[in-house]
C-alpha cells in the first residue's frame, strides 16, 4: 500500500516548468500522493505577463540579455479550474500578500481541496 500524505505544497517552482503538460503531470502526482489539500504558491499570472516584463526591464534595462534562455511560464487561472473540475476538487485563488516583495503584484496562489464526503 502506497503511503498518502495529508497535503502537498509547491512554493515558487511552477514558473520554471517547461510547459503546462509538465505542470499537469506534477499536479496529478500531488493529487495521487495526498488525501488532503494541495497548495501551489507563487504562480505567475498570465494576465500580468506584460506588466511583469515591463517592471523587470525597468529595474534592469539589460533584463532580456541577462535572463536569456531562462523562460518563465505564466498560467491562466482556467488551467487550474479545469484540473479541479476534472478531479472533483474545489479551487480558490489568493493574491500573494507579502509586503515588500517586488514580485507579489504578478503572482497568485492556488489552493485545491477535496470535496467533503457526505455522511447521511
Model-found features: residue ranges?
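Short glycine-dipeptide loop
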Residues: 33-39
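Class I (Rossmann-like) S-adenosyl-L-methionine-dependent methyltransferase catalytic domain
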Residues: 1, 39-120
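Alpha-helix termination/capping residues and helix-transition junctions
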Residues: 2, 31-32
Amino acid at each position: 500500500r502506497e503511503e498518502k500524505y495529508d497535503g502537498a505544497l509547491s512554493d515558487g517552482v511552477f514558473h520554471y516548468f517547461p510547459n503546462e503538460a509538465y505542470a499537469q503531470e506534477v499536479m496529478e502526482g500531488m493529487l495521487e500522493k495526498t488525501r488532503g489539500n494541495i497548495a501551489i504558491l507563487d504562480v505567475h499570472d498570465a494576465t500580468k505577463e506584460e506588466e511583469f516584463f515591463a517592471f523587470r526591464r525597468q529595474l534592469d534595462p539589460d533584463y532580456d540579455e541577462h535572463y536569456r534562455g531562462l523562460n518563465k511560464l505564466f498560467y491562466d487561472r482556467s488551467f487550474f479550474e479545469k484540473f479541479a473540475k476534472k478531479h472533483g476538487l474545489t479551487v480558490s485563488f489568493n493574491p500573494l500578500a507579502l509586503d515588500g516583495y517586488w514580485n507579489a503584484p504578478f503572482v497568485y496562489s492556488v489552493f485545491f481541496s477535496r470535496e467533503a464526503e457526505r455522511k447521511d
